[in-house]
Amino acid sequence: MILHIPNLLSLDELNHCRQTLSQAEWTDGKVTTGYQSAHLKNNLQLAQDSQQALELGQIIQNAANANPLFFSAALPKTFLPPLFNCYQHGGNFGMHVDNAIRRHPQLNQYLRTDVSCTVFLTNPDEY
């Protein structure tokens, strides 16, 4: 099922996320890719344990938990922290399937990933 939830973040939250990410230090996105799709991933990613990723991840998680449509559709028990990706100069992530099992970095345990989400922080005309 694909579910579109417009305006998950408030304008202030969105602007804060964008401002923070514009000053972030990005690394190779392959660090979180499984073996099968490593050759497909050509992007940059914020380090999962960076202060920016932790702060912005909490903002997104709080917004998702407060959104009745998201909450009723996903019924989340546990959230994995969001991954923040940046695509520049032809960057892409080819056809792939997200990992079904991932390690939660703060809980240090492996979890099934039954629901996958993408939160766009830029307007479509900026791609």
Features from the language model and the residues they span:
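Catalytic core of non-heme Fe(II) oxygenases with the double-stranded beta-helix
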Residues: 68-127
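Non-heme Fe(II)/2-oxoglutarate
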Residues: 1-83
